[in-house]
């Protein structure tokens, strides 16, 4: 049996459900409005909008990159893909929840395409690094795409193959990005929401490979 203390020293290994922290029933309180555009952070969202969860390292820089994209209606940061319900940031950073730091992207498909958002996703980080992103090491920094329907999932998987071909030409390893149906999403604490808009000189570890995804 692997103990929780051993997981803490192995930042590259996900916990099992039995090892994960128990969490709590109550959800994290979040601001009503996006700090940048004033739109609601939580559902229900206007009819016709679509959603996706992207994880590409520390969610501060990832969220800023995504809210800046044309056609993105609102963004929020949180945790997904693990076992612990309603985790805190410290719990996620412990490696004992199984969650990844993710950005909820709500977008208008009449103003941008899912394929365009995938291009931003692949080019904005290094998806070959496994349980880390640059100097940020831990399972919470793994690369993930959590999709809301079959069409999104198929498009994400096709784009992964296309980007893998381009990365191979540049000498990069295999993509480690997880692509899966959307799991429960838990909003992060209020101070994490739109963090780099509130703290313009704050830490941003986002960095791509320089490889482009062909149109």
From Swiss-Prot:
Gene Ontology cellular component terms for the protein in this record: cytoplasm
Catalytic residues identified in the record: 58
Alphabetical UniProt keywords: Oxidoreductase
One GO term (biological process): cellular response to oxidative stress
Listed EC numbers: 1.8.4.11
Protein name as it appears in the record: Peptide methionine sulfoxide reductase MsrA
A Pfam family annotated for this UniProt entry: PMSR
Catalysed reaction, written as an equation: L-methionyl-[protein] + [thioredoxin]-disulfide + H2O = L-methionyl-(S)-S-oxide-[protein] + [thioredoxin]-dithiol; [thioredoxin]-disulfide + L-methionine + H2O = L-methionine (S)-S-oxide + [thioredoxin]-dithiol
Family in the record: Belongs to the MsrA Met sulfoxide reductase family.
Purpose of the protein: Has an important function as a repair enzyme for proteins that have been inactivated by oxidation. Catalyzes the reversible oxidation-reduction of methionine sulfoxide in proteins to methionine.
Record GO terms (molecular function): L-methionine-(S)-S-oxide reductase activity; peptide-methionine (S)-S-oxide reductase activity
Keyword Oxidoreductase annotated: yes
HAMAP family membership: MsrA (MF_01401)
Species of provenance: Pseudomonas aeruginosa (strain UCBPP-PA14)
Cited InterPro entries: Met_Sox_Rdtase_MsrA_dom, Met_Sox_Rdtase_MsrA_sf, MsrA_MetSO_reductase
